[in-house]
């Protein structure tokens, strides 16, 4: 990798998250915007990435070909769609590039492809890159160990109308953190929908509820409810810049890693708490 600073490539440069990532990359010390990518045929191809993001001229032209920019970046940052991310993953694996993956909605095969690639390249893969959310995940593990065996657990998440997957990747990660603390597999205890006559709540399950409305950036709540009291742990994001800054922080952290699969708790050192 480049000795002076980390050079990053941003996928989906014209999207909401892509523009935030470009702004963050141009502003963060130790980071250089090396490349910005958009899909073939996009009207944004040929634009200056910084100007596209509202951050001023960057000198980096939006392109569609990874091959054309392979010498311009050390770490590839991807918050797009699973099918596109897996294509980028194969390229990065072939060329020894690190990856920061914030894409959600992968099936089991997609997750396995990421695990296999991490044997050769360094990857930070997380559903949410905000510091606050990752602190919350640690709190959920601790709450579950104390209250999870006897309380009813529900996870409620809300996002903007354009989000295409549900429950959110963060909500699923919350469920996995809680289930893991209880020595369970989330697949065996998750309840993703309720409609009509459902009967009484099955003890030991983890329920999920999803809201899609307006321009909500992201809200997540885990509820531990017992008779007479309940505990709610909530995180609310008001700007995507918190995710972008976290992703760039992860890219900087990858500078010293050769291979391996990591998440934001590794980046933040939360596993020691």
From Swiss-Prot:
Coiled coil: none annotated. NADP(+) binds at residue 39. It catalyses: (S)-2,3,4,5-tetrahydrodipicolinate + NAD(+) + H2O = (2S,4S)-4-hydroxy-2,3,4,5-tetrahydrodipicolinate + NADH + H(+); (S)-2,3,4,5-tetrahydrodipicolinate + NADP(+) + H2O = (2S,4S)-4-hydroxy-2,3,4,5-tetrahydrodipicolinate + NADPH + H(+). Its EC number is 1.17.1.8. (S)-2,3,4,5-tetrahydrodipicolinate binds at residues 160, 169-170. GO terms for molecular function: 4-hydroxy-tetrahydrodipicolinate reductase; NAD binding; NADP binding; oxidoreductase activity, acting on CH or CH2 groups, NAD or NADP as acceptor. Keywords: Amino-acid biosynthesis, Cytoplasm, Diaminopimelate biosynthesis, Lysine biosynthesis, NAD, NADP, Oxidoreductase. Pfam families: DapB_C, DapB_N. GO terms for cellular component: cytosol. NAD(+) binds at residues 12-17, 38, 102-104, 126-129. Its main location: cytoplasm. Pathway: Amino-acid biosynthesis; L-lysine biosynthesis via DAP pathway; (S)-tetrahydrodipicolinate from L-aspartate: step 4/4. The keyword tRNA processing does not apply. The keyword Amino-acid biosynthesis applies. GO terms for biological process: diaminopimelate biosynthetic process; lysine biosynthetic process via diaminopimelate. Homotetramer. Catalyzes the conversion of 4-hydroxy-tetrahydrodipicolinate (HTPA) to tetrahydrodipicolinate. This is 4-hydroxy-tetrahydrodipicolinate reductase. It comes from Salmonella paratyphi A (strain AKU_12601). The gene is dapB.
């Amino acid at each position: 990798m480049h000795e002076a600073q980390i050079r990053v490539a941003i996928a989906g440069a014209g999207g909401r998250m892509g523009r935030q990532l470009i702004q963050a990359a141009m502003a963060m010390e130790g980071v250089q915007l090396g490349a910005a990518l958009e899909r073939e045929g996009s009207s944004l191809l040929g634009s200056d990435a910084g100007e596209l993001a509202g951050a001023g001229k960057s000198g980096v032209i939006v392109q569609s070909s990874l091959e054309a920019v392979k010498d311009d970046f050390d770490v590839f940052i991807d918050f797009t769609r699973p099918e596109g991310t897996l294509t980028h993953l194969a390229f990065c694996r072939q060329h020894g590039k690190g990856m920061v993956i914030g894409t959600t909605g992968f099936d089991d095969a997609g997750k396995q492809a990421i695990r296999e690639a991490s044997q050769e390249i360094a990857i930070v893969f997380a559903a949410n890159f905000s510091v606050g959310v990752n602190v919350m995940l640690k709190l959920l593990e601790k709450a579950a160990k104390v209250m999870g065996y006897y309380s009813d657990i529900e996870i409620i998440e809300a996002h903007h109308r354009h989000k295409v997957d549900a429950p959110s990747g963060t909500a699923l990660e919350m469920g996995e953190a809680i289930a893991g603390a209880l020595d369970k597999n989330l697949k065996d205890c998750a309840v993703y929908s309720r409609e009509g006559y459902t009967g009484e709540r099955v003890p030991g399950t983890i329920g999920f509820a999803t809201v899609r409305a307006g321009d909500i950036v992201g809200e997540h709540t885990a509820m531990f409810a017992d008779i007479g009291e309940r505990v709610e742990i909530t995180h609310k994001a008001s700007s995507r810049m918190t995710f972008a800054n976290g992703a760039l922080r992860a890219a900087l952290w990858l500078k010293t890693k050769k291979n391996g699969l990591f998440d934001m708790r590794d980046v933040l050192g939360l596993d020691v708490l």
